[in-house]
């Protein structure tokens, strides 16, 4: 094997862990397992507490209508994450580094601020979700739960210090727990299969009904995470694959398989949350359920089993713990890529978590605990508004043959990707128009 075909000794991995070795031969599943991991770290962002809020509200208020939005946004996410992986593997740069190389310093600062805003919005959702889970499980007041969330910097520090594989194993274990909890709740709720299948078909009502559109954009914002595009383009480089063209092509195939499988799991979980909300709340006339606490309180009485509410709270806590790991990694990648500034993981965690906790405490003090439900959904709309500022640079870079070489995307993929970008921009413009003109 020539020098250019040997695996790179260093990988652009945020925690500076040793690259994960990839077997050169043997069964295909050994190579898939070697590449499995980054996709599941990315999938965490698609199952965070923000998704729960929009899915619960959407299912309770509109029944199965928004299942089509979950499906379409998940397919959009699979495409965009595949392009993010392509950028990292083909160029050896993550999205933030590519922006720094190709854009002016002022543009990079603007993009960095937009991405940090998205990370804080995501962190805000995690603080609220984790605080609610602590309240549901242990009776802690929401404000105290939010303050305790600052201490998760220790958890992140321990996990990152263990290396890439233990970190990925922790995340996959919690994802499995979340999936199992909702699989049981789905069985208990006994949804109407015909209505569920009908919900996966797109309906014009999503665009014509302002309430449906608001929740739909929240689902898009909760599903297609802007900071995940930065995260994935870095994490795929944590594998020690040959940096030759043939090696990159194989790595890209395995990376896309990894992320597509992980995002399929996320699709199933998000659909299950909405289906449970629709079949338990909407079907029984409880269309006013707009937050996670209401959902928890009503699950057991309506289903007749205390287990349903317990599983709901456990899965919510697992979701919040998982998300805190990936937002820390994404924050490191973004800050180092755009600004060449690197903070210790615990310092980075305390900084963003501290900023996210303040609005939760303020809203709780001014409007009570009910105000946090609307804050949670609003955070997902903020995420959606930041999406174009991550998606458009990504599409520019993966189309650039000078940067990507033979791995630049073809015309068909380019047209499809830009159609997705235009759809995201169009949804955001429609939302702004609804806000401006009532």
From Swiss-Prot:
- For region Disordered, the annotated ranges are 1-20
Name of a matching Pfam family: Nramp
Subcellular location, in the record's words? Answer: Cell inner membrane
Q: Which GO terms describe its biological process?
A: iron ion transmembrane transport; manganese ion transport
- Principal localization? membrane
Residues that span the membrane, as ranges = 60-80, 118-138, 140-160, 169-189, 211-231, 261-281, 297-317, 350-370, 375-395, 415-435
Which Gene Ontology CC terms are recorded? plasma membrane
Record bears the keyword Transcription regulation: no
Membrane topology designation: Multi-pass membrane protein
Q: Mind listing the UniProt keywords for this protein, alphabetically?
A: Cell inner membrane, Cell membrane, Ion transport, Membrane, Symport, Transmembrane, Transmembrane helix, Transport
- Please name the GO terms that the record assigns under molecular function: cadmium ion transmembrane transporter activity; manganese ion transmembrane transporter activity; metal ion binding; symporter activity
Summarizing the function annotation, the protein's role is: H(+)-stimulated, divalent metal cation uptake system.
Q: Would you identify the family this protein belongs to, as annotated?
A: Belongs to the NRAMP family.
Q: What is this protein called?
A: Divalent metal cation transporter MntH 2
Instruction: Give the species.
Output: Pseudomonas aeruginosa (strain ATCC 15692 / DSM 22644 / CIP 104116 / JCM 14847 / LMG 12228 / 1C / PRS 101 / PAO1)
């Amino acid at each position: 094997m020539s020098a250019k075909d040997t695996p790179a000794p260093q990988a652009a991995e945020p925690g500076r862990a040793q690259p994960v070795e990839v077997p050169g031969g043997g069964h295909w599943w050994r190579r898939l397992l070697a590449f499995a991991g980054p996709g599941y770290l990315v999938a965490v962002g698609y199952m965070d507490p923000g998704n729960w809020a929009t899915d619960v509200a959407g299912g309770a208020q509109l029944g199965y209508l928004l299942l089509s939005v979950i499906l379409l946004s998940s397919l959009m996410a699979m495409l965009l994450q595949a392009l993010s992986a392509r950028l990292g593997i083909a160029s050896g740069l993550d999205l933030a580094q590519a922006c720094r190389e190709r854009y002016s310093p002022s543009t990079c600062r603007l993009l960095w601020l937009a991405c940090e805003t998205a990370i804080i919005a995501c962190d805000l959702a995690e603080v609220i979700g984790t605080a609610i889970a602590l309240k549901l499980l242990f009776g802690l007041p929401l404000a105290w739960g939010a303050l305790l969330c600052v201490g998760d910097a220790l958890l992140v520090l321990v996990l990152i210090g263990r290396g890439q594989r233990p970190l990925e194993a922790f995340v996959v274990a919690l994802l499995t727990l979340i999936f199992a909890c909702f699989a049981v709740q789905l069985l208990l709720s006994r949804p109407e299969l015909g209505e569920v299948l009908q919900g996966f078909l797109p309906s014009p009502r999503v665009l014509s009904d302002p309430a449906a559109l608001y929740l739909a954009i929240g689902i898009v914002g909760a599903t297609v995470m802007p900071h995940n595009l930065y995260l994935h383009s870095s994490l795929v480089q944590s594998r020690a694959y040959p940096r030759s063209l043939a090696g990159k092509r194989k790595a890209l195939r395995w990376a896309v398989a990894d992320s597509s499988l992980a995002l399929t799991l996320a699709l199933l979980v998000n659909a299950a949350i909405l289906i449970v909300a629709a079949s338990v709340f909407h079907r029984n006339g409880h269309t006013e359920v707009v937050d996670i606490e209401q959902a928890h309180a009503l699950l057991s009485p309506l289903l007749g089993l205390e287990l349903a509410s317990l599983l709901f709270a456990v899965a919510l806590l697992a979701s919040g713990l998982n998300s805190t790991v990936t937002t820390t990694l994404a924050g490191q990648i973004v800050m180092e890529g755009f600004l060449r500034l690197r903070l210790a993981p615990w310092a980075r965690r305390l900084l963003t978590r501290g900023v996210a906790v303040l609005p939760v405490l303020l809203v709780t003090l001014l409007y009570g605990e009910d105000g946090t439900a609307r804050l949670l959904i609003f955070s997902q709309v903020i995420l959606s508004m930041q999406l174009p500022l991550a998606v458009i640079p990504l599409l520019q870079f993966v189309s650039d043959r000078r940067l990507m070489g033979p791995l630049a995307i073809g015309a068909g993929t380019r047209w499809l990707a830009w159609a997705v970008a235009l759809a995201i921009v169009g949804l955001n413009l429609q939302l702004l128009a609804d806000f401006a003109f009532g």
